[in-house]
């Protein structure tokens, strides 16, 4: 039974090693903050913020050096808060060109093959004109004065973004299509051998 628990832990180890808000929003000329949570096992690794439709081809904007010091590249800064396993990215002086797909990523040193990927999570950045009176209900930073209907819509949209981020994660795909079938096969073999 301990073997089964150990194998199950191995299967789920990389699945949720890095999580993020899914989507954040801000105004032109303003700033926004993104916080991504990572597994404590990645403490001391370099973290970075990159832009692009895919995590494997995104262009690095700013990165840490493995310490907790804030690093800056133009209007974008990143800081690794190792004490609570959080990466904080701040984008300032926003323009509509800043809207798009970004990634929180962790630089790992044990990747040797094309099947492995750095742990990453997608974050959609929305930038709205400064004349907009309130942010749409799809933002991660809703004011509490919104009606309950907008809050329910926001919660549903955020869940969909987070679910899509999980499903597009290579760790999740490896879990579902490789580790889980292998685990189930080994579990069946154990039960079959014990039955004899």
Curated annotation (Swiss-Prot):
One example of a Gene Ontology biological process annotation: immune system process
Disulfide bonds: 36-104
Secretion signal, residue range per the UniProt entry: 1-17
Transmembrane segment boundaries: 172-192
Glycosylated residues (UniProt): 84
One Pfam family linked to the record: V-set
Extracellular side: 18-171
InterPro entries: CD300_family_receptors, Ig-like_dom_sf, Ig-like_fold, Ig_sub, Ig_V-set
SUPFAM superfamilies found in the cross-reference section: Immunoglobulin (SSF48726)
Keyword terms of this UniProt record: Cell membrane, Disulfide bond, Glycoprotein, Immunity, Immunoglobulin domain, Membrane, Receptor, Signal, Transmembrane, Transmembrane helix
Predominant localisation class: membrane
Presence of the UniProt keyword Cell membrane in the record: yes
Highest taxon listed in the record's lineage: Eukaryota
GO cellular component: plasma membrane
Its membrane topology: Single-pass type I membrane protein
Side Cytoplasmic, residues: 193-196
UniProt-annotated location(s): Cell membrane
Residue ranges of domain Ig-like V-type in the record: 18-122
Family as reported in the entry's similarity comment: Belongs to the CD300 family.
Role: Probably acts as an activating receptor.
Quaternary data: Interacts with TYROBP.
Protein name: CMRF35-like molecule 2
Taxonomic source organism: Mus musculus
